[in-house]
Amino acid sequence: MATVVIAGRANVGKSTLFNRLIGRRKAITEKIEGVTRDIIKGLVVYNETSFLLYDTCGVFESTRDPVLLAMRDKAFEAFRKADLILFVVDGRSGITSEDEYVAQQLRKIAKKVLMVINKSENMSVVEKNLPDIMKLGFAEYIPVSAQHGNNIDELLDKITNLLRESGEKSMLFKESSPKIAIVGKPNVGKSSLFNALLNMDRATVTPVPGTTRDPVDEMIEINGKKYILVDTAGMRRKSRIERKTIEQFSISRTIDTIQSADVVLLVIDATEGVTRQDKRIADLILSSGRAMVCVINKFDLVNVRKKDYEAALFTEMPFINFCRIVFTSAVKKSGLEKLFNAIDEAYESYCRKVPQQLLSKLASQLPLLSPALSRKNLRIYSIKQIKIKPPKFVIMVNKKELTDYQTEKTLQRFIRERVDQFTGTPLVIEFKSRR
């Protein structure tokens, strides 16, 4: 599939343009330089053609920040691999030395470049700046307003035409592969695990908590199976996050990623043990109706038996006792095969629909299995599975008012014990009164 990469200095509206082109808010957009750190990828579908669009960080000419240097290197690597580069400049404020630096680097790469003059709401201002813009040396250009959507269809027409001229194929594909989100507190090794799974340097890994701001996704194929892996920002306690900051927006994107994932890997630092924040994140994942695998990372740094650690973990978090626990060392790349096995198991459970006869049999056995339910004068007439992802069951009773949280937990337990374990996935129970 053809790849298009957005390039430019900081704060010219690259992420706003990215969000506009893919049709949803995926990259973080704020008026602060250096907001986008990781390379964000999205699929653009336009007039029955499609291409992969990449948003990169703002390119800084001179910086000593190790994170910005690492991201600049990643941006240049993306430019070299691109089929087409969208060089975004600010039509309102005009050209700066940073723009000239980016243009110089793009000319060295010698790729096809389309210059996108953003913030072009006022064309009289753009026309004043146009002579300086044209000195950057790129003949193909188009004025747009990413914020207001002006000229976006014309931009898409230009992109698809340029890709066709260069012989690049764009095509449609079905995103049927399971989406796996990697979440956890800052500095538990999420990005290291992400890179170990991909076996490539894709997300920026540094010892500074909070390096990954945007969700970063990548397709991976293992033993003929394809997965979409998503690395996310670390989630700290709300009380420690300043309002209206980049970190707050990053956490919001992480929550969105959890809610759009199929399986979530909750990464816990083995050297810290289970913390309150780990419990909060686990509860968020399961209450969002996502399948979950608990990953105990950095296990090579502790001297504890797996059996003992697992027992202690389930004591701290009994509400995840249906989830698989996998012990890993992202740095040493150990436990990764078992992790994929656990992902497969959780995803299969997440998508499973059980035979109706098993549910009918359970419904008939419940008065004997749980006399406590009968003592509440609650009668259960039928159990029916109506959905998957996650499995959802409608339970017909005489009076819905007689049910409570404990009734729900009891029914979930019996379904797991008598029908299917549903390892790794939460079960949704809905009670309905029989008319």
Swiss-Prot record:
<feature type="binding site">
    <location>
        <begin position="184"/>
        <end position="191"/>
    </location>
    <ligand>
        <name>GTP 2</name>
    </ligand>
</feature>
<keyword id="KW-0677">Repeat</keyword>
<feature type="binding site">
    <location>
        <begin position="231"/>
        <end position="235"/>
    </location>
    <ligand>
        <name>GTP 2</name>
    </ligand>
</feature>
<dbReference type="InterPro" id="IPR005225">
    <property type="entry name" value="Small_GTP-bd"/>
</dbReference>
<dbReference type="Pfam" id="PF14714">
    <property type="entry name" value="KH_dom-like"/>
</dbReference>
<feature type="domain" description="EngA-type G 1">
    <location>
        <begin position="2"/>
        <end position="167"/>
    </location>
</feature>
<feature type="binding site">
    <location>
        <begin position="297"/>
        <end position="300"/>
    </location>
    <ligand>
        <name>GTP 2</name>
    </ligand>
</feature>
<dbReference type="InterPro" id="IPR016484">
    <property type="entry name" value="GTPase_Der"/>
</dbReference>
<feature type="domain" description="KH-like">
    <location>
        <begin position="352"/>
        <end position="435"/>
    </location>
</feature>
<keyword id="KW-0690">Ribosome biogenesis</keyword>
<feature type="binding site">
    <location>
        <begin position="8"/>
        <end position="15"/>
    </location>
    <ligand>
        <name>GTP 1</name>
    </ligand>
</feature>
<dbReference type="Pfam" id="PF01926">
    <property type="entry name" value="MMR_HSR1"/>
</dbReference>
<dbReference type="GO" id="GO:0042254">
    <property type="term" value="P:ribosome biogenesis"/>
</dbReference>
<dbReference type="InterPro" id="IPR031166">
    <property type="entry name" value="G_ENGA"/>
</dbReference>
<keyword id="KW-0547">Nucleotide-binding</keyword>
<dbReference type="InterPro" id="IPR032859">
    <property type="entry name" value="KH_dom-like"/>
</dbReference>
<comment type="function">
    <text>GTPase that plays an essential role in the late steps of ribosome biogenesis.</text>
</comment>
<dbReference type="InterPro" id="IPR027417">
    <property type="entry name" value="P-loop_NTPase"/>
</dbReference>
<comment type="subunit">
    <text>Associates with the 50S ribosomal subunit.</text>
</comment>
<dbReference type="GO" id="GO:0005525">
    <property type="term" value="F:GTP binding"/>
</dbReference>
<feature type="domain" description="EngA-type G 2">
    <location>
        <begin position="178"/>
        <end position="351"/>
    </location>
</feature>
<feature type="binding site">
    <location>
        <begin position="118"/>
        <end position="121"/>
    </location>
    <ligand>
        <name>GTP 1</name>
    </ligand>
</feature>
<dbReference type="InterPro" id="IPR015946">
    <property type="entry name" value="KH_dom-like_a/b"/>
</dbReference>
<dbReference type="GO" id="GO:0043022">
    <property type="term" value="F:ribosome binding"/>
</dbReference>
<feature type="binding site">
    <location>
        <begin position="55"/>
        <end position="59"/>
    </location>
    <ligand>
        <name>GTP 1</name>
    </ligand>
</feature>
<comment type="similarity">
    <text>Belongs to the TRAFAC class TrmE-Era-EngA-EngB-Septin-like GTPase superfamily. EngA (Der) GTPase family.</text>
</comment>
<keyword id="KW-0342">GTP-binding</keyword>
<protein>
    <recommendedName>
        <fullName>GTPase Der</fullName>
    </recommendedName>
</protein>
<dbReference type="InterPro" id="IPR006073">
    <property type="entry name" value="GTP-bd"/>
</dbReference>
